[in-house]
Amino acid sequence: MKYKSLSLLIIALLSACTLGAQNRKKVGVVLSGGGAKGVAHIGALKVIEEAGIPIDYVVGTSMGALVGGLYSIGYTPQQLDSIVNAQNWKFLLSDTPDPETTLLSEKLKEEQYLLSVPIAGKSAHVSDAGIIKGRNISQLLSELTVGYHDSISFNRLPIPFACVSDNIVNGSKVVFHNGILATAMRASMSIPGVFAPVYLNGKVLVDGGLIDNYPVDIARQMGAEIIIGVDVQNPLMKADELTSLSSVLGQIINLVGEESYRKNVKDSNIHIQVDVDGYSAASFNSEALDTLMRRGKEAAMKDWEKLIALKKEIGIGTEYRAEYPGPFKIPTRTMLDTIPSVAQISP
């Protein structure tokens, strides 16, 4: 009788824990833009997972869209770390063709445009209106998202995902909740004057950091009740730092989205600010990337106690361990939610 009572008690406790987890608040992870600095998101994600925090939504801009998009389809932080370290970034950030893989037909098309993918009978393409067309980075994104090349609903990914781009035809914000994942990520990281824009359905799409570099507002719209944000944006520069064309242009870009940025920082439950001092959006050498990933982890570890305490607000116990979808596996056709067209939101 004693053992039966003990068994019933254990079952009741397990049921209560399960019910509590089911009734918990939804958590959104927001990853800011920042070029090379965005690899710091990988280190921060490692800590968030170590803390056992459940992740219900991922939203990113620019490099945050790249890291977030891959994470949302099941790439683990460890896999992402390996991917970053395995790349020849000088090659990726150029349009130099790989002679071992470039077909003659591709070489003939090389001077026209980079990317052509079917979307509801039309195509998205990248023109030459930038220093870099982005041929090689787009090829990498395509390879990393095998199984997600159809037009799909990002809400049906292992973790629902969205990313932000800016339509420079009218200055509107474009939020990708559907479409071809590689195209959405590429559009979000089209830094004006560096990477060519993505032309899609009458829109000319550039880096979302121009309009919403830290998109907490989008995560809230998706249903996130708790926000954990990772921020690699540099603070505004002082007068004596604005001494070059690049610094002036960077300051102008940051000022455009400053009001939205401050509001979104204030709306974060935990705002993980990564120390990116000494590094820029172009710091793609291996030593810098390793340092930035380490700094991302260090920044998140500084907020460790806050992360653990946040579990109570989420509605889970401090010992709760979330399950994550990785490691990445190529999905079967039945896992994809094919839709007839790309839906975009322009608030």
Predicted regions and their residues:
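Patatin-like phospholipase
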Residues: 19-61, 69-347
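Bacterial Sec-dependent N-terminal signal peptides
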Residues: 1-25
